[in-house]
Amino acid sequence: MTAPEFVPLGEPYDPGCPPAEAAEAFHGILARRRSVRFFSDREVPREAVEAIVRCATTAPSGANKQPWRFVAVSDPELKSAIRAAAEKEERELYAHRASEEWLKDLEPLGTDDVKEYLEVAPWLIVVFRMTATDDGGKTYYSDESVGLATGMLLAAAQMAGLSTLTHTPSPMRFLAELLGRPKHERAYMLIPLGYPAEDCTVPIHAISRKPLEEVLLFDPKP
């Protein structure tokens, strides 16, 4: 067995203020993020997409296999094809697949099977989870790893002043087909990326967050 090699950590990031203060400042940015369904067609440069995805790729992953692939789509014809396929699946969802409880939970959000934003947003970022490496090797904890990377992508987009939406049409096999992806890449999430429309609105129901004392426990006893 080959002994692992190590290097010095390097100079840790110093926010220049106490940890709680730095975290609160970051929270102030993230807390303004909204899932946007009304986008402007205002151009977003390719360099911005590259920088945002580069942030996502800093996520930790099982055995550092980095089991993700990000496909950026701006071509109008391809976006139109993705919208048509996504809406087909969504019609099935709302008409047959979703339970009554699910549909009732969606009512306050005002969602439906019309996904105009898939054509209006300047970019669609399709996140793929790799079930194997490109050379046929194993990946580990790929769901968790890609989930972490996706969250970091959303945070980076917010830091860049751009809006996003996490869209998961089910099933998503059509994305691999339309984008020519190999069998070991599974569509994980479809993320429109861009500026919000000037008259963009968001559902009140989506703004509230559980209080910290409900989601954070310190040293709980059985």
Where does each model-flagged region fall?
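Glycine/small-residue-rich phosphate/adenosyl-binding loop
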Residues: 2, 66-146
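Small-aliphatic-rich amphipathic alpha-helix that forms the alpha element of a beta-alpha
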Residues: 52-56, 125, 130-178
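Glycine-rich phosphate/pyrophosphate-binding beta-alpha loops
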Residues: 57-64
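Glycine-rich, charged/polar anion/phosphate-binding loops
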Residues: 54-57, 108-112, 175-177, 200-201
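N-terminal accessory segments that position/regulate proteins before the catalytic core
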Residues: 1-36, 40-50
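Short alpha-helical scaffolding segments that buttress acidic/His motifs in well-ordered protein cores
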Residues: 30, 52-56, 191
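C-terminal helix-cap and adjacent tail motif
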Residues: 2-9, 13-22, 112, 189-222
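A glycine-rich helix N-cap at a beta->alpha junction
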Residues: 90-98, 180-205
